[in-house]
């Protein structure tokens, strides 16, 4: 698969970077809100269920607007790819339970650390159809700088 990671490579790449930045901003907000709802309800599981219900409704609305040609592709899609939803459930359930005890910042620090490690592995091997971006010394150095930066923000 062709490498398309240069954010200066046109309007689409910059738009993608901005969208992902906004998604990243939303993760700790979602974590804090779901965690707080879990405390108010005395049930992190109920808070997670409400988060999933809202997410399902929004996804369903987007699906109704989207091109429907994907339906005929469902039977040929590798079945293991549908397990991705389990990772979402694990994240939302774990952040709802752990964050009130561990702190949003600490929880997100370890989420980011896990994301950096798994993203590097997925990119290096091109897992799940991802574009291959081999792990070089420079990339490892960049990841370590990011890890150190996240650690600094948590310990400042």
Q: Where are the predicted features?
A:
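Membrane-interface interhelical linkers
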Residues: 2-22, 36-40, 56-81, 125, ...
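Juxtamembrane helix-loop-helix junctions in multi-pass membrane proteins
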Residues: 32-53
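Hydrophobic transmembrane alpha-helices of multi-pass small-molecule transport proteins
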Residues: 136-154
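Hydrophobic core positions of alpha-helical segments in small-molecule transporters
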Residues: 50, 110-111, 138-141
């Amino acid at each position: 698969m062709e490498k398309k990671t240069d954010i200066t490579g046109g309007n689409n790449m910059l738009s993608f970077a901005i969208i992902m930045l906004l998604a990243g901003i939303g993760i700790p907000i979602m974590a804090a809100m779901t965690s707080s709802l879990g405390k108010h309800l005395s049930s992190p599981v109920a808070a997670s269920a409400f988060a999933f219900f809202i997410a399902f409704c929004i996804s369903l609305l987007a699906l109704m607007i989207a091109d429907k040609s994907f339906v005929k592709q469902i039977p040929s899609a590798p079945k293991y790819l549908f397990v991705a939803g389990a990772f979402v459930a694990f994240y939302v359930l774990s952040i709802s339970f752990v964050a009130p005890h561990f702190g949003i910042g600490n929880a997100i620090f370890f989420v980011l650390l896990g994301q950096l490690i798994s993203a590097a592995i997925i990119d290096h091997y091109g897992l799940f159809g991802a574009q291959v971006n081999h792990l070089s010394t420079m990339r490892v150095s960049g990841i370590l700088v990011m890890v150190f930066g996240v650690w600094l923000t948590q310990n400042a």
